[in-house]
Amino acid sequence: MAIRTAILTISDKCSQGKREDKSGRTIEEMLPEDIYEVCQKIIIPDDYGTITRTLRQFSDVLKVQVVLTTGGTGLGPRDVTPEATIAVCDRRIPGIGEILRSESYRKTPNAVLSRGVSVMRDNTLIINLPGSPKAVRECMEIILEFLPHAVDMIHGGGH
């Protein structure tokens, strides 16, 4: 059975049609179709309330197993994705953000400026990815190694 996945691009410019959503497309292209079913892919602005409502909708109503967000994890005044994600979480998973920053730092020291978090809300795993397509690709290569096992564990599978 495929892992029900949602892709959430968080970007003022993409949501206004002023920029193409290359990062969301990169995520979708990298998810093997035999393992993941992308059941939702939307673009929303960098707005705290919109982000929290959308994450709750994905988890509570649509019951997706994984939400991959892209954008809004930096230091800009409208970068509120981590705060909105934490607001809806039941449990934090710090190791994911730590490994993404650590491995990304090998390629660019700017990786330490990413504030992305990973959390669980009920049985949904939510992972914040950076906004740049290059950084998304690098992070996806890392998370694809453990994502199916993480989903299995959330649903009662073994360690």
Task: For the regions a language model picked out, list residue spans one by one.
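Non-catalytic beta/alpha edge segments that cap or flank active sites
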Residues: 1-159
